[in-house]
Amino acid sequence: MKFTLQSTAPQSAQHEYLLVLVTEQQLKNTADTYKINTLDTITHTSQFKSGFNEVLTLIGQAETCSYLNLVGLGDLKDLQPAKIAKLAQTIIKLVQTKFKQIHLDISALPIELHYLFALNLTQANYVFDEFKSKKSEAQLEQIHLITAQTGLTTQQLDLIQAIASGQDLARDLGNRPGNICFPEYLADQAKALAHEFPELLKVTILDEQQMADLGMNAFLAVSQGSDRPGRIITLEYNAQLEQAPVVLVGKGVTFDTGGISIKPAQGMDEMKFDMCGAASVLGTIRTLCEARLPIHVVGAVAAAENMPSGQATRPGDIVTTMSGQTVEILNTDAEGRLVLCDTLTYIKRFNPSLVIDIATLTGACVVALGKVVSGLFSPDDALAQELQQAGEQSFDRVWRLPVMDDYQELLDSPFADIANIGGPYGGAITAACFLQRFTRDYRWAHLDIAGTAWLSGTAKGATGRPVPLLVQFLANRVGTND
């Protein structure tokens, strides 16, 4: 979906659809601007008070357009980011299947909310009907934003459109089932991106033999149970820039049965979403390519399928990681940290300025934080603060949880250097502490997106988070190149 900016309202009835955000105090100004002569009577008869998300439809009653909707903002002081998202959903629902383009007057919306509102409009416009025999009737392609005053720039609108493209890719990948989206498929997606942006991207793919040669036995302990071979995929963006890269590492378990420590049947279909960390990395890379942000970034995807078989890892097995540390695998359903730990060791060769891993890692994080914010873990206060700020700016928020040495003893094993689970308490924290043992050589943060990567119920599907957060974080750093 594309945006344009206009400083004045359309003056011709040829604009078939117009939507205006209004407050009760601004109704008279709206009536004058759009020549709605009977608006006082209409609002009185319909009892339209411009309450939040309240909609009034006017057909043939405005001289400037044939079809007009007023959408109430309510009390402006109560307009929080969560309400902005709901407002965007209301607007898209009104027009998505009816119009290819609309004019949307946002003059009544506080200027500081314009960017977030435009971003939310793109998110609300997403449709996934790839496997439906009857396709969606959605057709909205362009929104002409009308406002005399705004902080939005053409560059910001271009970035919003690039974020939407990357977030849509992440959602598409997450929504595709495990029989379509498996490790080799993710590798093909990375190669397709590199083919689309050959001057910006360099892709490298490790197969299982190459991993074995590197001693990546923790990763292979997960993938060996599946007939689908694992892959480690790296995408280097703007490699020519003379700066240490930001490295994004995504967990890409394309389907997680739990392995021998098998999961319950109920809800197991949602384990196709266990690769949403990897999807967010690929989506972020796509956004960077479209926006052409001047920053050196490496995306790394740890792609594997966790299946039970005669070749699968058994609880109690011990493996030696690429780092040389040994791991006792007490639970094969704690597999994400196993594919990540070897990948976190592998990416040291890029001499990163910092590393962020993104993973649907623990149910414990969902218990702690629900499905509103992602879990943030980092021993680096400055890095954590940067991510928190980016989360607030993009309304893709995080909440910091501790990662400290006090928890490390919970991972002690009598037989190996470390166990892959830490007991029944603080599971999200001990998972982060496990990863921390493989990240001592660089600045590092871990995002546990188990609660935010997808929705269940009637709105079931991948969210594409945390693409907005990651892009905002990188955009904020463009001027500093720390």
Swiss-Prot record:
<feature type="active site">
    <location>
        <position position="263"/>
    </location>
</feature>
<dbReference type="InterPro" id="IPR008283">
    <property type="entry name" value="Peptidase_M17_N"/>
</dbReference>
<comment type="function">
    <text>Presumably involved in the processing and regular turnover of intracellular proteins. Catalyzes the removal of unsubstituted N-terminal amino acids from various peptides.</text>
</comment>
<feature type="binding site">
    <location>
        <position position="335"/>
    </location>
    <ligand>
        <name>Mn(2+) 1</name>
    </ligand>
</feature>
<dbReference type="InterPro" id="IPR011356">
    <property type="entry name" value="Leucine_aapep/pepB"/>
</dbReference>
<dbReference type="GO" id="GO:0006508">
    <property type="term" value="P:proteolysis"/>
</dbReference>
<dbReference type="InterPro" id="IPR023042">
    <property type="entry name" value="Peptidase_M17_leu_NH2_pept"/>
</dbReference>
<keyword id="KW-0031">Aminopeptidase</keyword>
<keyword id="KW-0464">Manganese</keyword>
<feature type="active site">
    <location>
        <position position="337"/>
    </location>
</feature>
<dbReference type="GO" id="GO:0030145">
    <property type="term" value="F:manganese ion binding"/>
</dbReference>
<keyword id="KW-0963">Cytoplasm</keyword>
<dbReference type="GO" id="GO:0070006">
    <property type="term" value="F:metalloaminopeptidase activity"/>
</dbReference>
<keyword id="KW-0378">Hydrolase</keyword>
<protein>
    <recommendedName>
        <fullName>Probable cytosol aminopeptidase</fullName>
        <ecNumber>3.4.11.1</ecNumber>
        <ecNumber>3.4.11.10</ecNumber>
    </recommendedName>
</protein>
<feature type="binding site">
    <location>
        <position position="333"/>
    </location>
    <ligand>
        <name>Mn(2+) 1</name>
    </ligand>
</feature>
<keyword id="KW-0645">Protease</keyword>
<feature type="binding site">
    <location>
        <position position="256"/>
    </location>
    <ligand>
        <name>Mn(2+) 2</name>
    </ligand>
</feature>
<feature type="binding site">
    <location>
        <position position="335"/>
    </location>
    <ligand>
        <name>Mn(2+) 2</name>
    </ligand>
</feature>
<feature type="binding site">
    <location>
        <position position="251"/>
    </location>
    <ligand>
        <name>Mn(2+) 2</name>
    </ligand>
</feature>
<dbReference type="Pfam" id="PF02789">
    <property type="entry name" value="Peptidase_M17_N"/>
</dbReference>
<dbReference type="Pfam" id="PF00883">
    <property type="entry name" value="Peptidase_M17"/>
</dbReference>
<comment type="similarity">
    <text>Belongs to the peptidase M17 family.</text>
</comment>
<keyword id="KW-0479">Metal-binding</keyword>
<feature type="binding site">
    <location>
        <position position="274"/>
    </location>
    <ligand>
        <name>Mn(2+) 2</name>
    </ligand>
</feature>
<dbReference type="InterPro" id="IPR000819">
    <property type="entry name" value="Peptidase_M17_C"/>
</dbReference>
<dbReference type="GO" id="GO:0005737">
    <property type="term" value="C:cytoplasm"/>
</dbReference>
<dbReference type="InterPro" id="IPR043472">
    <property type="entry name" value="Macro_dom-like"/>
</dbReference>
<feature type="binding site">
    <location>
        <position position="256"/>
    </location>
    <ligand>
        <name>Mn(2+) 1</name>
    </ligand>
</feature>
